Amino acid sequence: MTVFEGNLQDTRDLKFAIVIARFNDLVVGKLLSACEDSLRRHGVAVGPDSHQVDYAWVPGSFEIPMVARQLALSGRYDAIVCLGAVIRGQTSHYDHVASEVAKGIQALAFQTGVPVTFGVLTTDTMQQAIERAGIKSNLGWEYGENAIEMATLTRKIRHLVAVRAVQPELPEQTPPSLLQ
């Protein structure tokens, strides 16, 4: 049996894109800061001169899936992080936006094979959103870690598929050392 598992260490050659919604920037800015901190602490070069992280700013969360799809199809990224916040208001707008964003992000991961982290908060109140992007607990950190883990996991799986294509005689129970 082969066991596949991502890790948080092999980040030196990984390339990430972060798609950030400007709407609800009070919350989204905090998610972005924590996500960047997570990536940085796991060895990813983050910042204006980074060769590992690119940023795409969009007006709101509804626009995230389209831009993330274009980035995924470019073939340049090992993972994409989508950051936004959809907060319930007085109309049904929230239900439509939250649902379509979630579906769009999930669909593009399936269609492109590029891991896409769903970092769009969907909350009933601004207070709930602030709590999820706050000092005590900030989900942005987890979104960064999830992107790293999924990028390293899919890289291992792709490597095994490529090795098996060249060496079909490899046993089904390939030792983990061959998957590195």
Curated annotation (Swiss-Prot):
Pathway linked to the protein: Cofactor biosynthesis; riboflavin biosynthesis; riboflavin from 2-hydroxy-3-oxobutyl phosphate and 5-amino-6-(D-ribitylamino)uracil: step 1/2
Family matches, as SUPFAM superfamilies: Lumazine synthase (SSF52121)
GO biological process: riboflavin biosynthetic process
Pfam families associated with the record: DMRL_synthase
Recorded GO CC terms: cytoplasm; cytosol; riboflavin synthase complex
Active-site feature positions: 93
Keyword ATP-binding included in the entry's annotation: no
Residues at which 5-amino-6-(D-ribitylamino)uracil binds: 23, 61-63, 85-87, 118
Catalytic reactions on record: (2S)-2-hydroxy-3-oxobutyl phosphate + 5-amino-6-(D-ribitylamino)uracil = 6,7-dimethyl-8-(1-D-ribityl)lumazine + phosphate + 2 H2O + H(+)
Enzyme class: transferase
Disulphides: none
Record bears the keyword Methyltransferase: no
Function: Catalyzes the formation of 6,7-dimethyl-8-ribityllumazine by condensation of 5-amino-6-(D-ribitylamino)uracil with 3,4-dihydroxy-2-butanone 4-phosphate. This is the penultimate step in the biosynthesis of riboflavin.
PANTHER family associated with the record: 6,7-DIMETHYL-8-RIBITYLLUMAZINE SYNTHASE, 6,7-DIMETHYL-8-RIBITYLLUMAZINE SYNTHASE DMRL SYNTHASE LUMAZINE SYNTHASE
Family: Belongs to the DMRL synthase family.
UniProt protein name: 6,7-dimethyl-8-ribityllumazine synthase
